[in-house]
Amino acid sequence: GCGEVEVHLGDARNLNFINDESIDLICTHPPYSNIIKYSENIPGDLSHCDIKDFYKEMEKVSSECYRVLKKNKFCAILIGDTRKKGHMVPIGFNIMDIFLKTGFKLKEIVIKEQHNCSSTGYWRNQSIKYNFLLIAHEYLLIFKK
């Protein structure tokens, strides 16, 4: 049969309207730290955080996800990496570490091809010349509680 569906507008850092261990599946694609702006003036918008604050806020998300997810159920997060000032920032791996420290177990990493990526001309040319890949993917991190 069909069950009832409830929709709430909220923030994944505070899911106080959801009971402990009551959710079967969590799927999220959080706003990346200072990469794509999702709003202009929404307080607490993670897309406006610097990287260190973004990680701190994602610790709150991880804790709330762990609290509301039923045992032996799954949490899936789509997240990618970036470059800042010419250096690679492994956001995906750092988020994976945050969720592991919360208590989740990593079940799977799925690599999703990402289109419309930008890269510096030098590295793009080098990648073509030597047949290697640049950041052109995101990670679908699948955790189990």
Give residue spans per PLM region.
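Class I S-adenosyl-L-methionine-dependent methyltransferase catalytic core
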Residues: 1-145
